[in-house]
């Protein structure tokens, strides 16, 4: 079983994504965070444990790009899927430049979101 971190300010959305990851991809939830600061602290506490991060772009204390910078500085090699309702291309491009594997709309079909996560090499069986 693989491990995920979910970064999203809304607990109900985190719980729904965790359920889908466990049910469809056999991914265990390792950490949850609702802010950039919390995500940074938890990711750096667990180097090498987290196989994938699913993060909202807009967070109460910043956005996913701040978290991506922290991951880069820590040389963490973990794929990050950024989910957002924001449509502005510059913020999507910035997230990709800083290391996000993909940026997707939160209203994308669930199957597409799961397929994107499934495509991350670290989630394949050893």
Question: Residue ranges of each PLM-predicted region?
Answer:
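Conserved active-site segment of CheY-like receiver
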Residues: 9, 83-87, 107
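Two-component/phosphorelay signaling modules centered on CheY-like receiver
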Residues: 11-31
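Acidic, metal-coordinating helix/loop segments flanking the phosphotransfer/catalytic sites
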Residues: 34-52
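Acidic catalytic/metal-coordinating carboxylates
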Residues: 35, 63-66
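Active-site residues of response regulator receiver
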Residues: 56-57, 84
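Short amphipathic alpha-helix used as the core "switch/output" element in two-component signaling
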Residues: 65-77
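C-terminal output helix
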Residues: 108-118
């Amino acid at each position: 079983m693989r491990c995920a971190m979910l970064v999203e300010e809304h607990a109900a959305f985190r719980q729904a994504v965790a359920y889908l990851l466990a049910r469809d991809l056999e991914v265990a939830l390792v950490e949850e965070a609702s802010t950039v600061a919390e995500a940074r602290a938890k990711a750096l506490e667990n180097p090498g444990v987290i196989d994938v991060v699913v993060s909202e772009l807009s967070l109460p204390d910043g956005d996913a790009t701040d978290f991506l910078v922290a991951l880069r500085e820590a040389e963490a090699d973990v794929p990050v899927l950024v989910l957002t309702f924001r449509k502005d291309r510059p913020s999507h491009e910035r997230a990709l430049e800083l290391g996000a594997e993909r940026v997707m709309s939160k209203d994308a079909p669930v199957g597409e979101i799961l397929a994107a996560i499934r495509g991350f090499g670290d989630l394949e069986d050893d």
